[in-house]
């Protein structure tokens, strides 16, 4: 793939898409399978940069696994307890894979000594203070190597559980990371969440995967308090099927909502554990026609595609797709996306990046501390889109090609983080004739 890709105007949209495995579920399942008693066969594993970083780290930690030729099935033999480095000078490099590095920091804070975890330049910019502080409360000995509150870090073990307080308003990945290692701690763990919990559906994913591996966490209905017994062990479920990625589904469902025709995505459905399936409900509220099945969601264009004012804190990834859909709304009202501060601590500062790139194609955008106010253009303009090495920016701006102008996307290879063949799949449901 070249350093850019130009998508010419797409005239029609129609087809069926088999979704790649969920990134969030894939890396959670890999980590828990690695720490389980017994062997697990993971089916529909996502093959992407993020999962490859996790697999490489597990290999360095002595975990044995076997991948199918297409990397979508992984047979992994658990170590039956906490992960620990076999080498006192181990360094794990995890790129910009937040779903790998944060859970691994937590998992390795129990027993590992003198192990360093680091990432690429963007990952080093993403603060991890709240996770490190939480682990230190439980006895974890963690040292910042280059600058406070950021990667790289060196771990010296020591985490044992107990009473923990964690902020919930920065990233749900911090809470997920701590939750996944609570049963392996020597003490029972009581967690209190301070502030509003962002991206709550991702905590539901964590709890669901933990249940599949034999561990149930108690919590109140508001997700303010969690309790898990220590000195327990994960048990391999023998086989675990990973859902399709609901965030990735958003681009294809949006395409049908914008252009017409019908798109069916397979791999997620009405019983999905992923919060981003709520994206389909939002499309329906905006005027699209949605049909649900046990393992599919189908979208067709409605009479009008309406802008709305909505809190999208629960679906931060799919909400980016809504920002681009705003370009195509026809009810003469702005699209307002609220409660999205955590966009700023993702693979890029997504709030600023999205505002910048939307303006290039003609939208009038107001960027607030935690919101975007988007007025669609009278005529969408052709533009060269910077992706900031952010896979989701690249994928959602592909939707601009559903207008009557082309769009050129810089660094399309960044989609390898979660959806390596995205552009091929996207063009497969389009027709330029």
UniProtKB/Swiss-Prot annotation:
UniProt xrefs under HAMAP family: EPSP_synth
Matching PROSITE patterns: EPSP_SYNTHASE_1, EPSP_SYNTHASE_2
Pathway membership, UniProt: Metabolic intermediate biosynthesis; chorismate biosynthesis; chorismate from D-erythrose 4-phosphate and phosphoenolpyruvate: step 6/7
Pfam families: EPSP_synthase
Compartment(s): Cytoplasm
GO biological process terms, semicolon-separated: amino acid biosynthetic process; aromatic amino acid family biosynthetic process; chorismate biosynthetic process
Family statement: Belongs to the EPSP synthase family.
CC annotations in GO: cytoplasm
Catalytic activity of the protein: 3-phosphoshikimate + phosphoenolpyruvate = 5-O-(1-carboxyvinyl)-3-phosphoshikimate + phosphate
Protein name in the entry: 3-phosphoshikimate 1-carboxyvinyltransferase
Binding residues annotated for phosphoenolpyruvate, in chain numbering: 23, 98, 126, 173, 350, 392, 417
Keywords: Amino-acid biosynthesis, Aromatic amino acid biosynthesis, Cytoplasm, Transferase
NCBIfam families the UniProt entry points to: aroA
Primary enzyme class: transferase
EC number(s) per entry: 2.5.1.19
Active-site positions on this chain: 317 (proton acceptor)
Top-level taxon in the UniProt lineage: Bacteria
Residue positions binding 3-phosphoshikimate: 23-24, 28, 171-173, 199, 317, 342, 346
């Amino acid at each position: 793939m070249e350093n850019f890709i130009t998508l010419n105007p797409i005239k029609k949209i129609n087809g069926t898409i088999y979704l790649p495995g969920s990134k969030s579920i894939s890396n959670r399942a890999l980590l828990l399978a690695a720490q389980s008693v017994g062997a697990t066969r993971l089916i529909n594993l996502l093959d992407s940069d993020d999962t490859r970083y996790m697999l490489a780290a597990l290999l360095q930690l002595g975990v044995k696994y076997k991948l199918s030729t297409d990397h979508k099935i992984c047979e992994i033999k658990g170590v039956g307890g906490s992960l620990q480095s076999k080498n006192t000078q181990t360094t794990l490099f995890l790129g910009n894979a937040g779903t790998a590095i944060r859970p691994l920091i937590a998992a390795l804070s129990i027993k590992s000594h003198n192990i360093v975890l680091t990432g690429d330049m963007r990952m080093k910019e993403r603060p991890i203070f709240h996770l490190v502080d939480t682990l230190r409360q439980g006895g974890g000995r963690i040292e910042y190597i280059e600058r406070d509150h950021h990667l790289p870090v060196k771990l010296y073990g020591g985490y044992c559980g107990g009473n923990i307080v964690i902020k919930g308003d920065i990233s749900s990945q911090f809470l997920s990371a701590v939750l996944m290692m609570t049963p392996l701690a020597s003490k029972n763990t009581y967690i209190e969440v301070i502030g509003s919990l962002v991206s709550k559906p991702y905590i539901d994913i964590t709890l669901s995967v933990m249940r599949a591996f034999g561990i149930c966490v108690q919590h109140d209905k508001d997700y303010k308090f969690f309790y898990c017994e220590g000195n327990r062990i994960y048990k391999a479920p023998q086989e675990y099927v990973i859902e399709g990625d609901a965030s990735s589904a958003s681009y294809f469902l949006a395409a049908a909502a914008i252009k017409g025709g019908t798109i069916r995505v397979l791999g997620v459905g009405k019983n999905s554990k992923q919060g981003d399936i709520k994206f389909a409900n939002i499309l329906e509220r905006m005027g699209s026609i949605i049909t649900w099945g046990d393992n599919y969601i189908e979208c067709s264009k409605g009479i009008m595609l309406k802008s709305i004012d909505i809190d999208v804190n629960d679906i931060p990834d799919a909400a980016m797709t809504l920002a681009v859909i705003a370009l195509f709304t026809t009810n003469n009202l702005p699209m307002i996306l609220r409660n999205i501060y955590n966009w700023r601590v993702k693979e890029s500062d997504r709030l600023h990046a999205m505002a910048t790139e939307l303006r290039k194609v003609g939208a009038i955008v107001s960027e607030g501390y935690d919101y975007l106010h988007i007025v669609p253009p009278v005529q969408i303009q052709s533009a060269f889109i910077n992706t900031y090495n952010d896979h989701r920016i690249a994928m959602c701006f592909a939707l601009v090609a559903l207008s009557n102008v082309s769009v050129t996307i810089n660094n399309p290879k960044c989609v390898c983080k979660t959806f390596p063949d995205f552009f091929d799949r996207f063009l497969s449901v389009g027709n330029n004739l």
